[in-house]
Protein backbone atom coordinates (compact mmCIF):
# COMPACT_ATOMS: atom_id res chain seq x y z
CA UNK A 1 0.00 0.00 0.00
CA UNK A 2 1.17 3.51 -0.86
CA UNK A 3 0.18 6.33 1.49
CA UNK A 4 -0.47 9.57 -0.43
CA UNK A 5 -0.99 12.62 1.79
CA UNK A 6 -2.19 15.92 0.38
CA UNK A 7 -1.60 18.84 2.74
CA UNK A 8 -3.99 21.72 3.27
CA UNK A 9 -6.30 23.40 5.76
CA UNK A 10 -9.66 21.73 6.45
CA UNK A 11 -12.23 24.54 6.36
CA UNK A 12 -14.15 25.29 3.11
CA UNK A 13 -12.92 28.90 3.22
CA UNK A 14 -9.44 27.57 2.33
CA UNK A 15 -10.63 25.71 -0.78
CA UNK A 16 -8.75 26.95 -3.83
CA UNK A 17 -6.00 28.67 -1.82
CA UNK A 18 -2.32 28.27 -2.58
CA UNK A 19 -1.77 26.40 0.70
CA UNK A 20 -4.39 23.78 -0.24
CA UNK A 21 -2.94 22.64 -3.55
CA UNK A 22 -1.96 19.32 -1.91
CA UNK A 23 -5.65 18.67 -1.21
CA UNK A 24 -6.43 19.42 -4.86
CA UNK A 25 -4.11 16.63 -6.04
CA UNK A 26 -5.56 13.93 -3.76
CA UNK A 27 -9.08 15.17 -4.59
CA UNK A 28 -8.27 14.82 -8.30
CA UNK A 29 -7.03 11.26 -7.77
CA UNK A 30 -10.03 10.30 -5.64
CA UNK A 31 -12.37 11.70 -8.28
CA UNK A 32 -10.64 9.86 -11.12
CA UNK A 33 -10.94 6.56 -9.24
CA UNK A 34 -14.46 7.36 -7.97
CA UNK A 35 -13.16 6.82 -4.44
CA UNK A 36 -15.10 8.85 -1.85
CA UNK A 37 -13.38 10.29 1.20
CA UNK A 38 -14.59 9.09 4.60
CA UNK A 39 -13.43 9.51 8.19
CA UNK A 40 -10.11 7.77 8.84
CA UNK A 41 -8.75 6.20 12.03
CA UNK A 42 -7.24 9.48 13.17
CA UNK A 43 -7.38 13.17 12.37
CA UNK A 44 -7.79 12.65 8.63
CA UNK A 45 -10.17 11.65 5.86
CA UNK A 46 -9.19 8.78 3.59
CA UNK A 47 -10.09 7.39 0.19
CA UNK A 48 -8.96 3.96 -0.95
CA UNK A 49 -8.29 3.05 -4.56
CA UNK A 50 -6.13 0.78 -6.67
CA UNK A 51 -3.99 1.52 -9.72
CA UNK A 52 -2.60 -1.37 -11.79
CA UNK A 53 -2.65 -3.65 -8.76
CA UNK A 54 -1.10 -1.14 -6.34
CA UNK A 55 -3.30 -0.08 -3.40
CA UNK A 56 -3.37 3.64 -2.67
CA UNK A 57 -4.59 5.32 0.50
CA UNK A 58 -5.31 8.99 -0.23
CA UNK A 59 -5.27 11.13 2.92
CA UNK A 60 -6.52 14.64 3.70
CA UNK A 61 -5.56 15.72 7.24
CA UNK A 62 -8.43 17.30 9.19
CA UNK A 63 -5.94 19.26 11.30
CA UNK A 64 -4.62 22.62 10.24
CA UNK A 65 -1.43 22.62 8.17
CA UNK A 66 0.84 23.20 11.18
CA UNK A 67 -0.34 19.91 12.77
CA UNK A 68 -0.26 17.67 9.69
CA UNK A 69 2.13 15.25 11.38
CA UNK A 70 -0.68 13.98 13.63
CA UNK A 71 -2.63 12.67 10.65
CA UNK A 72 0.46 11.26 8.95
CA UNK A 73 1.55 9.33 12.03
CA UNK A 74 -1.98 8.01 12.69
CA UNK A 75 -2.37 6.72 9.12
CA UNK A 76 1.13 5.24 9.02
CA UNK A 77 0.63 3.42 12.30
CA UNK A 78 -2.90 2.17 11.62
CA UNK A 79 -2.05 0.84 8.15
CA UNK A 80 1.55 -0.11 9.05
CA UNK A 81 2.95 1.84 6.10
CA UNK A 82 6.71 2.27 5.86
CA UNK A 83 7.98 5.76 5.18
CA UNK A 84 9.45 4.72 1.80
CA UNK A 85 5.85 3.94 0.74
CA UNK A 86 4.62 7.43 1.63
CA UNK A 87 4.41 10.57 -0.50
CA UNK A 88 3.48 13.99 0.91
CA UNK A 89 2.09 16.62 -1.50
CA UNK A 90 2.34 20.28 -0.54
CA UNK A 91 2.72 23.84 -1.76
CA UNK A 92 6.17 25.42 -1.96
CA UNK A 93 6.65 29.17 -1.73
CA UNK A 94 10.26 28.80 -2.91
CA UNK A 95 9.22 27.48 -6.33
CA UNK A 96 7.46 29.51 -9.04
CA UNK A 97 3.90 28.68 -10.05
CA UNK A 98 3.93 25.80 -12.51
CA UNK A 99 6.96 24.01 -11.05
CA UNK A 100 6.81 20.47 -9.66
CA UNK A 101 9.64 19.03 -7.55
CA UNK A 102 9.77 15.48 -6.24
CA UNK A 103 12.39 14.56 -3.65
CA UNK A 104 13.17 11.40 -1.68
CA UNK A 105 14.07 13.46 1.41
CA UNK A 106 15.00 16.97 2.45
CA UNK A 107 14.35 19.93 4.67
CA UNK A 108 10.96 21.48 5.30
CA UNK A 109 11.92 24.47 3.13
CA UNK A 110 9.84 26.71 5.39
CA UNK A 111 6.66 24.67 4.78
CA UNK A 112 5.02 24.26 8.20
CA UNK A 113 3.13 21.08 7.32
CA UNK A 114 6.38 19.38 6.31
CA UNK A 115 8.06 20.80 9.39
CA UNK A 116 5.49 19.18 11.70
CA UNK A 117 5.67 15.85 9.84
CA UNK A 118 9.48 15.85 10.19
CA UNK A 119 9.14 16.64 13.92
CA UNK A 120 6.56 13.89 14.48
CA UNK A 121 8.46 11.26 12.48
CA UNK A 122 11.90 12.22 13.77
CA UNK A 123 13.30 12.13 10.23
CA UNK A 124 13.17 14.04 6.96
CA UNK A 125 13.65 10.85 4.94
CA UNK A 126 10.29 10.54 3.22
CA UNK A 127 9.21 11.39 -0.31
CA UNK A 128 7.49 14.64 -1.10
CA UNK A 129 6.01 16.35 -4.13
CA UNK A 130 6.27 20.12 -3.90
CA UNK A 131 4.12 22.36 -6.06
CA UNK A 132 5.36 25.89 -6.72
CA UNK A 133 3.07 28.75 -5.69
CA UNK A 134 5.49 31.71 -5.85
CA UNK A 135 4.63 34.69 -8.01
CA UNK A 136 7.39 36.54 -9.81
CA UNK A 137 6.24 39.75 -8.15
CA UNK A 138 5.66 38.64 -4.58
CA UNK A 139 3.49 41.17 -2.76
CA UNK A 140 4.93 42.95 0.27
CA UNK A 141 3.68 41.88 3.66
CA UNK A 142 2.88 38.63 5.32
CA UNK A 143 3.65 35.34 3.61
CA UNK A 144 0.75 33.77 5.52
CA UNK A 145 -1.76 36.04 3.80
CA UNK A 146 -0.19 35.13 0.45
CA UNK A 147 -0.29 31.34 0.94
CA UNK A 148 -3.84 31.58 2.28
CA UNK A 149 -4.89 33.62 -0.75
CA UNK A 150 -6.41 32.22 -3.91
CA UNK A 151 -4.68 31.90 -7.26
CA UNK A 152 -5.45 34.64 -9.77
CA UNK A 153 -7.09 33.70 -13.08
CA UNK A 154 -3.83 33.13 -15.00
CA UNK A 155 -2.25 31.17 -12.15
CA UNK A 156 -5.40 29.04 -11.84
CA UNK A 157 -5.06 27.91 -15.47
CA UNK A 158 -1.49 26.79 -14.81
CA UNK A 159 -2.33 25.19 -11.45
CA UNK A 160 -5.14 23.15 -12.99
CA UNK A 161 -2.57 21.63 -15.38
CA UNK A 162 -0.08 21.21 -12.52
CA UNK A 163 -2.66 19.32 -10.44
CA UNK A 164 -3.29 16.97 -13.37
CA UNK A 165 0.44 16.40 -13.92
CA UNK A 166 0.99 15.95 -10.17
CA UNK A 167 -1.71 13.27 -10.08
CA UNK A 168 0.17 11.46 -12.87
CA UNK A 169 3.40 11.83 -10.87
CA UNK A 170 1.71 10.24 -7.83
CA UNK A 171 0.66 7.24 -9.90
CA UNK A 172 4.18 6.93 -11.30
CA UNK A 173 5.57 7.04 -7.74
CA UNK A 174 3.12 4.32 -6.68
CA UNK A 175 4.17 1.98 -9.48
CA UNK A 176 7.83 2.83 -10.07
CA UNK A 177 9.17 4.60 -6.96
CA UNK A 178 10.43 8.07 -6.20
CA UNK A 179 13.61 7.97 -8.30
CA UNK A 180 11.68 7.14 -11.48
CA UNK A 181 9.01 9.75 -10.72
CA UNK A 182 11.72 12.37 -10.18
CA UNK A 183 13.24 11.73 -13.61
CA UNK A 184 9.84 11.90 -15.30
CA UNK A 185 8.12 14.74 -13.47
CA UNK A 186 10.61 17.26 -12.01
CA UNK A 187 9.72 20.08 -14.36
CA UNK A 188 7.81 23.23 -15.04
CA UNK A 189 4.32 22.77 -16.45
CA UNK A 190 3.49 25.51 -18.97
UniProtKB/Swiss-Prot annotation:
Its recorded name reads Peptidyl-tRNA hydrolase
The similarity annotation says:
Belongs to the PTH family.
- Site note Discriminates between blocked and unblocked aminoacyl-tRNA, residues: 9
| Organism phylogeny | Bacteria, Pseudomonadati, Chlorobiota, Chlorobiia, Chlorobiales
InterPro entries with a match to the protein in the record:
Pept_tRNA_hydro, Pept_tRNA_hydro_CS, Pept_tRNA_hydro_sf
Binding residue positions for tRNA: 14, 64, 66, 112
For this protein, the record's Pfam families field holds: Pept_tRNA_hydro (PF01195)
Coiled-coil stretches are none
List the GO cellular component terms: cytoplasm
- Swiss-Prot/TrEMBL site (Stabilizes the basic form of H active site to accept a proton) positions: 91
Give the reaction(s) catalysed.
an N-acyl-L-alpha-aminoacyl-tRNA + H2O = an N-acyl-L-amino acid + a tRNA + H(+)
Query: Might you give the EC number(s) for this enzyme?
Result: 3.1.1.29
Tell me which species this is from: Chlorobaculum parvum (strain DSM 263 / NCIMB 8327) (Chlorobium vibrioforme subsp. thiosulfatophilum)
Alphabetically sorted, this entry's keywords are:
Cytoplasm, Hydrolase, RNA-binding, tRNA-binding
Tell me the enzyme class: hydrolase
Q: Which residues are named in the active-site annotation? A: 19 (proton acceptor)
Annotated GO biological process = protein quality control for misfolded or incompletely synthesized proteins; rescue of stalled ribosome
Q: So what does this one do?
A: Hydrolyzes ribosome-free peptidyl-tRNAs (with 1 or more amino acids incorporated), which drop off the ribosome during protein synthesis, or as a result of ribosome stalling. Catalyzes the release of premature peptidyl moieties from peptidyl-tRNA molecules trapped in stalled 50S ribosomal subunits, and thus maintains levels of free tRNAs and 50S ribosomes.
Q: Which GO terms describe its molecular function?
A: peptidyl-tRNA hydrolase activity; tRNA binding
Q: How does it assemble?
A: Monomer.
- Predominant location of this chain? cytoplasm
| SUPFAM superfamilies hit by this protein | Peptidyl-tRNA hydrolase-like
Compartment(s) where it occurs, according to its Swiss-Prot or TrEMBL record: Cytoplasm
Amino acid sequence: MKLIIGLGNPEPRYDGTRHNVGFEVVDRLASSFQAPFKAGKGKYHEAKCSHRGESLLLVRPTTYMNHSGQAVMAAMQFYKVKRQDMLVICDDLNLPVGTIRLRAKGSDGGQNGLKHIIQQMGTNEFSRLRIGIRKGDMPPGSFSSFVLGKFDEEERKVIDRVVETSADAVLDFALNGIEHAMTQFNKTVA
